[in-house]
Amino acid sequence: MNGWKKIYLLAYLLVLTAFTGCGTKIVIVQKADGNSTIEMNLELGKVFEKVLDESTAALNEMSGKQKPDFFYADEIKKSLANAGLKNVKVSSTERTKLNVAFTGKFEFIEGGTNSLNLKLNPESVKKFASSLGSEFNSIMDLFMAPVITGEELSREDYMETLAAIYGKELSDDLAKSTIELTLESASGKKKNFPIPMVQFLMLNEEKNFSIE
């Protein structure tokens, strides 16, 4: 599989984390052989869970499911394996929780024995979103994320827009939420990066997170 497909898959998981509340952790470990292991632990926030349930209520009624799962572990595992990733592990013990781990070589991760650099490029997120099916894009449409739409908004304007449509509870929830990113070099050197959710949603340029 080509490198873009791997970028798309990571972009999908990163975009997903932007709506999962404060229970999101990502660990990237550089291996001596040049591969990287990525582990993600995601948990939907209560507010986002409520918004998803309300937004899909009509479809759920048609399918006869009151509370369908949000994550389908087998399908996610198959997609990651088909992209050429190794040691793929995916589990979802509850409808609001997802644990993912896999190993591979990625163009957006560069590292040596004592160094590691992760590049988040909004262009790869946009390209990925346009290639996805209607289900994922429907979720993205709900939140009108500037990283996807390309619209130039101030942080204040974006939060006010979300509050006007979905209520202040949701906008406040996103405003205080973070992605807890941990990088670990091949030598075991670690560094933590708390990334504000809103900063990711409004990503409009390449961001680098590094251990040197």
Language model segments and positions:
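Bacterial N-terminal signal peptides that target proteins for export
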Residues: 1-9
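Post-signal-peptide N-terminal segment of Sec-exported extracytoplasmic proteins
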Residues: 43-75, 139-140
